[in-house]
């Protein structure tokens, strides 16, 4: 992938950009095999990759510069701003949005937040695009609601320029820290969720719900999990750390009982909406802590699917699963180091199958799907 920002030494986020994709995949595979070297693996499936550029469905832009000349991108460690509107990881459809946002920031009088001076209002612009219909969700992260009335007043101009903006919100993040969003979300549009569709499964994206940033690879990850589950004698499963329900909604069949657990209420609202659309009545989604939910249950289903954040599922949940011993565990991980650590805490299981998904090209990161079977 060619990147003018990298060539000019202005951005180093894609540390592996100079390596061809096959080399990157090979290095990631070696890393994963090293991490799982202590465990016999029955089957290594071929790694899955997607496009090497234009694949991201989300942009998280720090807003800096002045109200007349805002910059959208990032801040270097020394505080120097860098405009990343031309980043080749973004699809071409993002360019007109960035182009319209710059004059809009001036029109609405949204002074970019100055970290050094602790002054200004507009901290971040968060943009998400649906692959299914090209609809977009735009979030303005502000320090306070001081400029809210001005923003509302100027908004019709932006909506006229960009009819693809289906969901527009303001998020209030008052803390002087590099935290992307606060708890308060104010909707400026009637529509509150973005419709997405992977493998004929309807999914919804709401402002404060996590959603994978590489749809081409994520859709293959969900489809693979579905294929693996279809091969197992399973009538009841849990989907822990389920997010908007991507795994559970793909794996569920009309006669399967499935419980999805996720701590974020916004994500659970999305999952419930999808389940209703699919007419799946035996699916239950609840906004709870996954570990607390699981460890309070007196029995387990045949299959427990986990998709934890980078820290992994942790010892308490590993101990519980070891004791209760479900027949199958499917572990989807964005951090193979913590996954390997967790598998060590599950001594009664063998690794049936492993597959690497290159969700983050040009970096050392990857996603991995592992099927564990009770010995």
From Swiss-Prot:
[4Fe-4S] cluster binds at residues 3, 11, 14, 87. The keyword Cell membrane does not apply. It comes from the Bacteria. CDD domains: AdoMet_MTases. GO terms for biological process: rRNA base methylation. HAMAP family: 23SrRNA_methyltr_RlmC. This is 23S rRNA (uracil(747)-C(5))-methyltransferase RlmC. It comes from Escherichia coli O1:K1 / APEC. The lineage of its organism: Bacteria, Pseudomonadati, Pseudomonadota, Gammaproteobacteria, Enterobacterales. The gene is rlmC.
């Amino acid at each position: 992938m060619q990147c003018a920002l990298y060539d000019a030494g202005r951005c180093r986020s894609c540390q592996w950009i100079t390596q061809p994709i096959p080399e990157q995949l090979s290095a990631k595979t070696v890393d994963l095999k090293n991490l799982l070297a202590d465990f016999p693996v029955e089957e290594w499936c071929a790694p899955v990759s997607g496009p090497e550029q234009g694949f991201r469905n989300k942009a998280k832009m720090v807003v800096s510069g002045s109200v007349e000349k805002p910059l959208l991108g990032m801040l270097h460690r020394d505080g120097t701003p860098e405009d990343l509107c031309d980043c080749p990881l973004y699809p071409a459809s993002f360019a007109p949005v960035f182009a319209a946002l710059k004059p809009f920031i001036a029109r609405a009088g949204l002074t970019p937040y100055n970290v050094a001076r602790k002054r200004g209002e507009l901290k971040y612009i968060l943009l998400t695009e649906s692959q299914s219909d090209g609809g977009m969700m735009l979030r303005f992260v502000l320090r306070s609601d001081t400029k809210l009335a001005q923003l509302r007043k100027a908004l019709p101009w932006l909506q006229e320029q960009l009819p693809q903006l289906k969901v527009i919100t303001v998020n209030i993040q008052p803390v002087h820290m590099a935290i992307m969003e606060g708890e308060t979300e104010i909707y400026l549009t009637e529509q509150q969720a973005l419709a997405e569709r992977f493998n004929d499964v309807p999914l919804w994206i709401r402002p404060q719900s996590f959603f994978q940033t590489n749809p081409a690879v994520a859709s293959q990850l969900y489809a693979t999990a579905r294929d693996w589950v279809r091969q197992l004698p399973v009538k009841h499963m849990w989907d822990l750390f389920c997010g908007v329900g991507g795994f559970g909604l793909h794996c569920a069949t009309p006669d399967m009982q499935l419980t999805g657990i996720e701590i974020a209420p916004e994500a659970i609202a999305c999952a419930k909406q999808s389940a209703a659309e699919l007419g799946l009545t035996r699916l239950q989604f609840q906004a709870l802590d996954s570990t607390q939910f699981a460890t309070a249950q007196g029995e387990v289903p045949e299959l427990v699917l986990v998709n934890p954040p980078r820290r992994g599922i942790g010892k308490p949940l590993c101990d519980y699963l070891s004791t209760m011993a479900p027949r199958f565990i499917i572990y989807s991980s964005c951090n193979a180091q913590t996954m390997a650590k967790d598998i060590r805490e599950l001594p009664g299981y063998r690794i049936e199958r492993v597959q690497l998904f290159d969700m983050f090209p040009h970096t050392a990161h990857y996603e991995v799907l592992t099927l564990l079977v009770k010995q």
